[in-house]
Curated annotation (Swiss-Prot):
Described function: Multifunctional enzyme that catalyzes a series of essential post-translational modifications on Lys residues in procollagen. Plays a redundant role in catalyzing the formation of hydroxylysine residues in -Xaa-Lys-Gly- sequences in collagens. Plays a redundant role in catalyzing the transfer of galactose onto hydroxylysine groups, giving rise to galactosyl 5-hydroxylysine. Has an essential role by catalyzing the subsequent transfer of glucose moieties, giving rise to 1,2-glucosylgalactosyl-5-hydroxylysine residues.
Region (Accessory region): 295-520
Region (Important for dimerization) location: 672-715
GO biological process, one term: basement membrane assembly
InterPro entries named among the record's database cross-references: Collagen_mod_GT25, IPNS-like_FE2OG_OXY, Nucleotide-diphossugar_trans, Oxoglu/Fe-dep_dioxygenase_dom, Pro_4_hyd_alph, Procol_lys_dOase
Gene: PLOD3
Tissue: Ubiquitous. Detected in heart, placenta and pancreas and at lower levels in lung, liver and skeletal muscle.
Name the UniProt record assigns to this protein: Multifunctional procollagen lysine hydroxylase and glycosyltransferase LH3
Taxonomic source organism: Homo sapiens
Annotated disulfide bonds: 279-282, 379-385, 563-698
């Protein structure tokens, strides 16, 4: 490690006063067995960070004995993430090694903890150490830090890393004691420079048998070596392999700027996730929300920062969350004037449902970052706020237990994995580029597609996540988490947590829901959700396709045949019918029912109606997609042997009124088959109407709103529209496969 002390502080080291070193015959030989019970791992940590707990978890997996120095003490070793330092570690180790000064049979391995993972067993470690022929073996790296000028004093090596790294070393207790007892410097002086100068003394190096692990047989420092490291999967264990030297290191050290890469490796090594066992620690340290007792208080912060499809459905889902509403405070920031009517419609229900509510509207003129800072700080300042649940309006939580599940995962920060339907776009990044933007990790696709299931340490999350309230109060007390930089608010948020060493976890153990696509949401339409069949097909179907359509397609006896080869089935929801009619009336340019029609290629309509074509309102492509997706499969199930591409040139809404055009004379349609959907209710919106098929003398007099009539067109099914006697009747017609 390094810290902020000036580099040249100990250019002059005191002379070493060492007892005679072991002779060559006393040094360990490759065949000498070493008892793992004589091995002690010593590390340093001032706080039980998530990195430290990860280190302990890996040590426990292999049954290492670990002694931690410095817990609860103040760190005085400098800002080792940015400059030199770390001398405090040597001072602590010096004091500790006094206990083992005479233990010739004991082997000590010293490693950092926050950025270290153990990947092999004590037996393997000791075997490799003995094979090294050393009394003290340091890890090695490609950089001569902190003084590059010392590089020429290092012995040349044929293959491997040349320079010492102080983040890990292993040796006999007596030898380590002889080394560290020479420390007489400041806590923020540099530990690596101290060990480097001792190693560069040729006489001392030979006398004490000091060596470097040039080929990463034991220690793998990641800085400068990321291209050398790959994951090696066994059935119930994962470790790393150094492909440059064909070694299997035991200590993985994310030194320097490689913390995120270590987090990635730590998702697997040693048993984070294995092909056979799956997630190896997902069930550790969980909490259970006991029944009969009040669950933790939650601050639910909802953000509507952009025009978002299906917002009324999102607001209604808040009422359905499987969590006691009297334990939830709701904060809602709406940045869009367009959505004010939607929120106004739902706000009375939300007020009655949750224990407390706060609405911040567009009139406050808060930026997205400022709004998020405001919400998070309200939780931070409230000692009763146990969890902060941030939820963006484009996150569709179909799993109503999401909040409960995330709380029980018992992490400081955790997000549910969400992705766009059928896409790889998700609410997390598996890696970062050098400029801290998106980069795809090797396992990204497997995580999004849930081919690997577990809890993952990732560098970026957004749109939905849960944070412990005490984490905000104790570890992230500053208010400007989102708006404190020029970057995107979510990127600033994630960097704030990463810089504090707080892990950003992602769970894909459950199906939580999905994300909406919002970039092409056009609010110029009266009902813009209607246009979302391409971008958000699942949500579009839920809102606009009849709830019984799927049952009808599966042959559950819903489809009726009121006339020969005339099939009747549920297709559109009431909302779809209403919004389609509203769009047409909003457009308002009805044809007038004349034979002359400039919209047609020939300019003449033989059987004219008062209508508006889908093309006129910009809905042609969307309607054709509906035909392909929903009408085509139904047609092929009703007419076996017929395959349709669901092509249609004529797609239009017809309006019938007694004083305008009440009926339609007998005619054949210019189609292979025709789709005719009732868009409003007989008896409520109009009287009369219906359809008569003359060849069969068969009348359908009571069309059902949202139900479609499907019948052959140009040859057999000669038909007429019966008179509408009162009100206004609307139908949607498509001439399919003309």
């Amino acid at each position: 490690m390094t810290s902020s002390g000036p580099g040249p502080r100990f250019l002059l080291l005191l002379p070493l006063l060492l007892p005679p070193a072991a002779s060559a015959s006393d040094r360990p030989r490759g065949r000498d067995p070493v008892n793992p019970e004589k091995l002690l791992v010593i590390t340093v940590a001032t706080a039980e960070t998530e990195g430290y707990l990860r280190f302990l978890r890996s040590a426990e997996f292999f049954n290492y004995t670990v002694r931690t120095l410095g817990l609860g003490e103040e760190w005085r070793g400098g800002d080792v993430a940015r400059t030199v330092g770390g001398g405090q570690k040597v001072r602590w180790l010096k004091k500790e090694m006094e206990k083992y000064a005479d233990r010739e049979d004991m082997i000590i391995m010293f490693v950092d903890s926050y950025d270290v993972i153990l990947a092999g067993s004590p037996t393997e470690l000791l075997k490799k150490f003995v094979q090294s022929g050393s009394r003290l073996l340091f890890s090695a790296e490609s950089f001569c830090w902190p003084e590059w000028g010392l590089a020429e004093q290092y012995p040349e090596v044929g293959t491997g890393k040349r320079f010492l790294n102080s983040g890990g070393f292993i040796g006999f207790a007596t030898t380590i004691h002889q080394i560290v007892r020479q420390w007489k410097y400041k806590d923020d002086d540099d530990d690596q420079l101290f060990y480097t100068r001792l190693y560069l003394d040729p006489g001392l190096r030979e006398k004490l048998s000091l060596n470097l692990d040039h080929k990463s047989r034991i220690f793998q420092n990641l800085n400068g070596a990321l291209d050398e490291v790959v994951l090696k999967f066994d059935r119930n264990r994962v470790r790393i392999r150094n492909v440059a030297y064909d070694t299997l290191p035991i200590v993985v050290h994310g030194n320097g700027p490689t913390k995120l890469q270590l987090n990635y490796l730590g998702n697997y090594v040693p048993n984070g996730w294995t092909p056979e066992g799956g997630c190896g620690f997902c069930n550790q340290d969980r909490r259970t929300l006991p029944g009969g007792q009040p669950p933790p208080r939650v601050f639910l912060a909802v953000f509507v920062e952009q025009p978002t499809p299906f917002l009324p459905r999102f607001l209604q889902r808040l009422l359905l969350l499987d969590y006691p509403p009297d334990r939830v405070t709701l904060f809602l920031h709406n940045n869009e004037v367009f959505h004010e009517p939607h929120i106004a419609d739902s706000w009375p229900q939300l007020q009655d449902h949750f224990s407390a509510v706060k609405l911040v509207g567009p009139e406050e003129a808060l930026s997205p970052g400022e709004a998020r800072d405001m919400a998070m700080d309200l939780c931070r300042q409230d000692p009763e706020c146990e969890f902060y649940f941030s939820l963006d309006a484009d996150a569709v939580l179909t799993n109503l237990q999401t909040l409960r599940i995330l709380i029980e995962e018992n992490r400081k920060v955790i997000a549910p994995m969400l992705s766009r339907h059928g896409k790889l776009w998700s609410n997390f990044w598996g890696a970062l580029s050098p400029d801290e933007y998106y980069a795809r990790s090797e396992d990204y696709v497997e995580l999004v597609q849930r081919k690997r299931v577990g809890v993952w340490n990732v560098p970026y999350i957004s749109q939905a996540y849960v944070i412990r309230g005490d984490t905000l109060r104790m570890e992230l007390p500053q208010r400007d988490v989102f708006s404190g930089s020029d970057t995107d608010p979510d990127m600033a948020f994630c960097k704030s947590f990463r810089d504090k060493g707080i892990f950003l976890h992602l769970s894909n153990q459950h199906e939580f829901g999905r994300l909406l696509a919002t970039s092409r949401y056009d609010t110029e339409h009266l009902h813009p959700d209607l246009w979302q069949i391409f971008d958000n097909p699942v949500d579009w179907k839920e809102q606009y396709i009849h709830e019984n359509y799927s049952r009808a397609l599966e042959g559950e006896g819903i489809v009726e045949q009121p006339c020969p080869d005339v099939y009747w089935f549920p297709l559109l929801s009431e909302q779809m019918c209403d919004e389609l009619v509203a769009e047409m009336e909003h457009y308002g340019q009805w044809s007038g029912g004349r034979h002359e029609d400039s919209r047609l290629a020939g300019g003449y309509e033989n059987v004219p109606t008062v209508d508006i074509h889908m093309k006129q309102v910009g809905y042609e492509d969307q309607w054709l997609q509906l035909l392909r997706t929903y009408v085509g499969p139904m047609t092929e199930s009703l007419f076996p042997g017929y395959h349709t591409k669901a092509r249609a040139v004529m797609n239009f809404v017809v309006r019938y009124r007694p004083d305008e055009q009440p009926s339609l004379r007998p005619h054949h349609d210019s189609s292979t088959f025709t789709l005719n959907v009732a868009l409003n209710h007989k008896g409520l919106d109009y009287e009369g109407g219906g359809c008569r098929f003359l060849r069969y003398d068969c009348v359908i007099s009571s069309p059902r709103k949202g139900w479609a009539l499907l019948h052959p067109g140009r040859l057999t099914h000669y038909h007429e529209g019966l008179p509408t006697t009162w009100g206004t009747r609307y139908i949607m017609v498509s001439f399919v496969d003309p």
